[in-house]
């Protein structure tokens, strides 16, 4: 399946590929 962006991001980093930090949650870029 495709990665889901929704984890909390710390220090501007998202660990899910294709996601960027839109504090405090990762969003698809």
From Swiss-Prot:
Cystine residue pairs: 5-19, 9-21, 14-26
PROSITE patterns (alphabetical): CYCLOTIDE
Cross-link Cyclopeptide (Gly-Asn), sequence positions: 1-29
Signal peptide region: none
Summary of the function given for this chain in its UniProt record: Probably participates in a plant defense mechanism (Potential). Binds to and induces leakage in phospholipd membranes, particularly ones containing 1-palmitoyl-2-oleophosphatidylethanolamine (POPE). In vitro, displays cytotoxicity against cultured cells. Not active against Gram-negative bacterium E.coli ATCC 25922 or Gram-positive bacterium S.aureus ATCC 25923 up to a concentration of 64 uM.
InterPro entries linked: Cyclotide (IPR005535), Cyclotide_sf (IPR036146)
SUPFAM superfamilies per UniProt: Cyclotides
GO BP annotations listed: defense response; killing of cells of another organism
Post-translational modification summary for this protein: This is a cyclic peptide.
Domain notes: The presence of a 'disulfide through disulfide knot' structurally defines this protein as a knottin.
Keywords from the named record: Cytolysis, Disulfide bond, Knottin, Plant defense
Protein known as: Cyclotide mela-4
Classification of source organism: Eukaryota, Viridiplantae, Streptophyta, Embryophyta, Tracheophyta
Family named by the database record: Belongs to the cyclotide family. Moebuis subfamily.
